[in-house]
A protein has these predicted regions:
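His/Asp/Glu-rich metal-coordinating catalytic cores
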Residues: 1
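Accessory nucleic acid-recognition modules appended to NTPase machines
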Residues: 7, 12, 16-170
Length: 170
C-alpha cells in the first residue's frame, strides 16, 4: 500500500509533506502545478537563443505523456523539431536533473555500455509529477496492479526512477 501511494504521489518533499498532513490527493494539485510552473519559468536559465527555449517548453508540456516509453528525438511527440534540436534540449534538461534519457545496451558483461545510437527511454525525475502532468492519476489510483496502469508506462517509470537512485546521477 505504501509503495502504491509513493508511486501515485511521488517523492517530491513538498508533496510528501502535504500528503502526510492531509491524506488527500486532490489537495496536492496546486503543489504539483507550482513545481511544474517553476520548471517552465526557469527555461531561460537552461537555454539561450530563441529556438532552444521553445523546444524545452514543448518537452515540458508534452514530454510527460512519453514517460517510461522509448522515444525518437526527431519529431518528438508529434512536433516538427529535428533530432539535433530535441537532443540538445533533452541534454539541458538532463543537466538540470529533470529527466534522464536511458539508452539500451546489448552488453552481456559489465560495464553495460549504453548504445547511444539507438532510441532512448524517457524517465522523469518523479513519478508523482508524471502522473499529474500526464493526467493519469485516476487511472493509477484505480489500478489493482501497477502494470495495468497507463499501459504499463507508470511501472516502467517507477522502476527506472528507482534504479537511477542507485547511481550517482540523481
Amino acid at each position: 500500500l505504501l509503495f502504491n501511494i509513493y508511486t501515485l504521489i511521488g517523492g517530491m518533499p513538498e508533496v510528501v509533506q502535504l500528503y502526510a498532513e492531509r491524506r488527500d490527493i486532490l489537495s496536492l494539485e496546486s503543489t504539483y502545478e507550482t513545481l511544474l510552473q517553476g520548471y517552465r519559468d526557469d527555461v531561460e536559465k537552461y537555454a539561450l537563443g530563441k529556438q532552444l527555449p521553445e523546444v524545452i517548453r514543448f518537452i515540458l508540456k508534452e514530454g510527460w505523456h512519453k514517460a517510461g516509453q522509448i522515444i525518437t528525438l526527431g519529431g518528438f511527440a508529434g512536433s516538427s523539431y529535428n533530432a539535433r534540436e530535441v537532443g540538445e534540449a533533452f541534454r539541458l534538461l538532463e543537466k538540470a536533473m529533470l529527466l534522464e534519457l536511458v539508452y539500451p545496451t546489448t552488453a552481456t558483461e559489465v560495464p553495460a555500455t549504453p548504445e547511444i545510437k539507438r532510441m532512448p527511454k524517457l524517465v522523469w525525475l518523479d513519478t508523482g509529477l508524471v502522473n499529474y502532468a500526464a493526467q493519469v492519476q485516476k487511472e493509477v489510483l484505480g489500478a489493482k496492479d501497477i502494470m495495468d496502469a497507463w499501459r504499463g508506462m507508470i511501472a516502467e517509470q517507477i522502476v527506472a526512477q528507482e534504479l537511477l537512485t542507485l547511481t550517482d546521477k540523481v
